[in-house]
Amino acid sequence: MLEAYRKHVAERAAEGVVPRPLNAEQVAGLVELLKNPPQGEEEFILDLLENRIPPGVNEAAYVKAGFLTAVTKGEVESPVVSRAKAAELLGTMQGGYNIESLVSLLDDAELAPIAVKALSHTLLMFDAFYDVEEKAQAGNASAQQVLQSWADAEWFTAKDKVAEKITVKVFKVTGETNTDDLSPAPDAWSRPDIPVHAKAMLKMEREGITPDEQGSVGPIKQIEELQKDGIPLAYVGDVVGTGSSRKSATNSVLWFMGEDIPYVPNKRTGGVCLGGKIAPIFYNTMEDSGALPIELNVQDMNMGDVIDIFPYEGVVRKDGAEISSFELGKVLLDEVRAGGRIPLIIGRGLTSRARTSLGLEETDLFAKPIDPSASDKGYTLAQKMVGKACGVEGVRAGQYCEPKMTTVGSQDTTGPMTRDELKDLACLGFSADLVMQSFCHTSAYPKPVDVNTHHTLPDFIMNRAGVSLRPGDGVIHSWLNRMLLPDTVGTGGDSHTRFPLGISFPAGSGLVAFAAATGVMPLDMPESILVRFKGEMQPGITLRDLVHAIPYYGIKQGLLTVEKAGKINEFSGRVLEIEGVEHLSVEQAFELSDASAERSAAGCTVKLSQESIEEYLNSNITMLKWMIAEGYGDVRTIERRIKAMQEWLANPELLTADSDAEYAHVIEIDLAEIDQPILCAPNDPDDARLLSDVQGTEIQEVFIGSCMTNIGHFRAAGKMLEEFNGSLNTRLWVAPPTKMDKDQLTEEGYYGIFGRAGVRIETPGCSLCMGNQARVADKSTVMSTSTRNFPNRLGNGANVYLASAELSAVGAILGRIPTKEEYLEFAQKIDATAADTYRYLNFHKMGQYTEKADTVIFQEPA
């Protein structure tokens, strides 16, 4: 075992990274060595046991806990690990497989004091709390000590307060840093391996940043040079963390700028991030990881500056002179002290339970968020939805709450990290009502590591009562949306988890794991911006044009700027609430809610008609029954969701915003004013332009796909290509969002049309959108229906215009962005058959689905 391990250490050292944590097989070998250690290796193998095995309910932790428990019981002997040492090491494992053993040691006269100390600082107790409480009530003095320690929050007070002054050196990245810069999509395969993945951070050259190897390895030498004097680095940028909800982006920053977590291999906490604007999901993920994120003016901070941050005073000084000021939320410094927002929440809950058990009043030890001032105004739709999930009428902007998570989504490039986080949380079963896992980002062109994920992650999810899709099924959102319940709240490990029914607050994998495991999520209720559409859509104008009208009108009203220095984005961190499109189908509404991600909004609501929602739920009940017939699981979870949908349909009620609800801003968009398509220019989804401003630009590649598309878009493109009846000079990629779309398009003959036109047809899923597998040619100019067009996302040096499927199809045919007149000529023909083109997948009216759905008999009768 040691020989193989040392070989692995040498191989990793050659790559410039630390070794992987030990797996279960290696720990089993280590256990045998610990029983009979080779001479001279005692210290080394003890260090492996202590520091190189992941905590929680990891398979390796199971073997470790089993060995240590056996030693404490005297069933196994080791010259290296005494009974006392074994008990001490059980106390470093955070939770999960060590808990039962530690609780039982409270009855062991010799080891009880060690168990008391260990349990006093263990937060992941869950139902084992009652075992300790029971012992305490039965007179066990050690258990009473533990209960009192929890009540006194010694797990928190034993940690150092955040320092009055924090000295850091500036690592300045000018302009916008998106999560693709910090965690590049082509390197998604390595995300769970934090030290390896971190090497790709900022691997593309940009102002002030010099990668070790352009396109492969980031500025590690530059970082190491700055760190030579021992002053910790702080990540500083004008705009930081926009884009995808990748916890891997935070992991990479903290790998270079954070600090080790005792007894936890290859993971770091702490660190400081300063940004003129910090995207809300990234900010939350930093909070969860124990970092200190601060929004403030960074224009007087330059690469290599040594600055002093005074967190309690709210100022930053350089050479004694004040260069910036800020205001922190009251709870943030408690979060940093506790090692993150999630440990703080779990710890506060544990302290509260202990105090209740002991008959003590609520503690005043923790900082409390400031409650917003009382208001006699009404609530917005989002405030009512979150209120319902908290058991109250509504939640005011600025109010802290923990809404119930009805639906949680996970996809395959964040899923392996979410799995690790769930293990760290000692989660063996989900508390959220429905948790769904997809395989949409990696199924088309999987690497061996992806294939392993495809084989292992479904069982992990279903064993915890989650629902697992299969590789090739399609995009997470196109499936998850069909599992939603009206007016409920959820989250997902993908920034485009933007429910068209209810509301969702997407998050990084750590917070998603917490939501899935506990069934709730921490939330500081954001303010809302109302977007109200009025009037009639003009001929040729699509929903994608309405999507782009929001930033276009935002720019016109001074609520949004494209310039990154001193960036204005009033949408950032707020909820987008959309009205005036009640007639849309839920599939169509998702196009609007989905794109709230590009605004860096915290969430989105869309006011829809009861008729649209009823049709959607009837369709989805059939789809979910069909899934059971097709062998999907967890069956009980799917059945429970079907019954909840049926209950809503039996008594349909929808929340509505109050007429006197308060909004941070109101944007009114007259559809009569939008008489030509609106695109987003390279390479910024905020840079909304009219078609006439960009017409004539030559196009080499076109992509029609992503969660922003539905079956109607592919019919529209197919009809244009059939009318064209020639060979394209552009490269056109087509990727339907689900296998159901693919099957229906095939049945209707559209795949034949695509084939004759030379279209590259992709597996249902994300395809080019994330850029983690297939990519467009370097430096090509592209029209795309994808979600965002950040630099290098779809291809290295590519210039990407975001546009509707209809406009993109015209671009593919012409080889350039058309004029308004050219486009409308094509669009007129599509409008003539709109009723046929824009039919959606109503499964309850499709025989191939109803026939199978009708065979399903529920395991548990209603």
Task: Annotate the PLM regions.
Residues Y5, V27, E41-E42, K64, ...:
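Short amphipathic alpha-helical segments that mediate assembly, nucleic-acid/protein binding
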Residues L2-V31, N36, L332-V336, R341-I346:
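Amphipathic alpha-helical packing elements
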Residues T92, N98, L105-D107, P113-A862:
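Fe-S-dependent hydro-lyases/dehydratases of central metabolism
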Residues A24-E25, N58-K64:
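Helix-turn-helix repeat elements of alpha-solenoid scaffolds
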Residues E15-P21, E43-E59, K73, V80-G95, ...:
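Structural detector for internal amphipathic alpha-helices that build alpha-solenoid repeat scaffolds
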Residues L30, I45, V63-T72, I99-V103, ...:
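Buried hydrophobic core positions in alpha-solenoid tandem helical repeats
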Residues V31-L48:
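Generic amphipathic, hydrophobic interface segment in small proteins and small subunits
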Residues L34-P38, V71-S78, L90, V103-E110, ...:
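Alpha-solenoid helical repeat architecture
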